[in-house]
Amino acid sequence: MKHLLTLCMLALCLCASAKETCPKVIPALQEWKGGSGKLALPAEGSIVIASADEAALKSVADVLAQDLKDLLGWNYTVKTGKPEKNAIYLSLTKPDKQLGEEGYVLAAGRYAGITAPARQGVFWGTRSLLQILYNEKGQLPKGVARDWPQYPNRGFMLDVGRKFFTMDFLRQYVKILSFYKLNEFQIHLNDNGFVQFFDNDWNKTYAAFRLESERFPGLTAKDGSYTKKEFTDLQRLGMEYGVNVIPEIDIPAHSLAFTHYKPEIGSDKYGMDHLDLYKEETYRFVDSLLDEYLSGEEPVFMGPDVHIGTDEYNAKEAEKFRYFTDRYLKYVEKYGKNVRMWGALRWLKGKTPVKADNVTINAWSYDWIDPNASLKDGYKIINTCDTYLYIVPAAGYYRDFLDIRWLYETWRVGKVNSREELPEGTPGLLGGMFAVWNDHCGNGISQQDVHFRTFPAAQVLAEKMWRGKNEAVSFEEFEALCKQMPEAPGINLLGRVQGEVVLPGQKEELSLNGTDSVATSLPEIGYPYAVEFEVNPDQEQNISGILFKGPHSTVYANWENKGNLAFSVTDIHLCFMLPSCLPVSGQRCV
């Protein structure tokens, strides 16, 4: 209580005239009471934790200190004690029904203070503090912000089954989501391509399961996977940053990775991407697979929630599907987990009961889930509407990029599909989640291509799911703010260029010995960009050489000794035929 009183006294001391306007952050603050003037924090200072709260808030302060360094170049030390002039002060206060677990109070006067009933609220307060300091060039408008989310679940789902994303990318995404107060990151760990694009041959159809398995050697994808330790470390990082990493193992459809490994559990009738629900071996396999990640004192799936898929099974097997779903909802729950699934029960109607208590459904399609009936039955739902919230890169159906303006100006969390809208505050409507599905395996889309699509979506949906009401400013103002905001402290996946680019130790010429190079001050350049260069090939040169290289891509001359120019990003190679003996001037790669 004393910490809250301290902040309130700080607010009362602010001059009543010349009120400061509400600071610009994403998502926008719920409440702001402006004071007079600005608090200019020093480039070297202190983060002070209330002595009684050190155990709960030390990790928050440590992350904040590193973020101040990465974002602004500031050096802040962490200590405990009482508030100090021009310092950042973190503390906990008594429970507050409106603030809940995620709300906080941020006040700027003699010092910058963040207080909240729970650690998570203080952490979200530091995200707002960082954004304000970035946008205000190191200053804080004096005043008091009171902020809380309208919806508790605000997330993003990434299909890593059809396309591998590096663990480094996933770890960076935890920080990006956290910076915009998106608190769920669902990892879709297995899936497969469409058989019609692989000569209608299930054996040729791409499929992958991305997690290390000791019980089933050979199950894990060979073209990219995560060790158990890497995945548990990712979840721990999420906990540190307030992001719940939710693993999804998709069964009983989308399961070709499992039937490639164990063909006898595949369905001859509906296709090998369907598990055969009539074979005991299917249940033995799934039981053991789930147990591998759920059992033990330190399970691999260490968070509170686990997703079991359950979407798009053939409707002719509704009763057996409902039995299977009910069985695995109960099976996963016995390990102490909250279970999630994709909506399917409108499409697969039947008499077989399916557990509803403590089960959360992704409401993704009008045809597959009845949101009102689901809520009535006792399920909780998360709006993951395919029409508005699905990104399927370069597929030609669904959306390649989300309609950011429409989402900002029109969409609400309650708009669960194109025909049904739930009122704001509907009990059981937990929030929303947007999703990336990489349906077309190997289509040339890179990690950076996906991020180019998802980052603007994350910004606008963070705004809509946190505030839960009409936009604070016009779309044009919001879009301008989005473009000036960083992805997160220390992260530049977009490859934005700031300042002058120089060539350290610039040389007039390079020794063509295969080892000489020149480096720029910039590791990479993001979209949109164009590269122009002249190539004077040596007719006698018979080796592949690197023209340009960054952390995520490489441009080769004489790719594989075939006389081609090649652009390579992760596992994707794009080749261009060039004359082998003549100089090529102004060859443009965009």
Language model segments and positions:
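Active-site neighborhood of glycoside hydrolase catalytic domains
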Residues: 258-360, 364-378
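Feature activates predominantly on carbohydrate-active enzymes
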Residues: 97-274, 281, 287-305, 438-440
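Bacterial Sec-dependent N-terminal signal peptides
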Residues: 1-22
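Acidic, contiguous N-terminal accessory segments
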Residues: 17-149, 339-348, 355-357, 487, ...
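Extracellular glycan-recognition modules
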Residues: 502-573
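Flexible, acidic glycine-rich loops studded with aromatic residues
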Residues: 354-359, 366-508
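Conserved, mostly hydrophobic/aromatic
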Residues: 47, 68, 118, 156, ...
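Short, aromatic/His-centered strand-loop micro-motif at the edge of beta-sheets
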Residues: 567-589
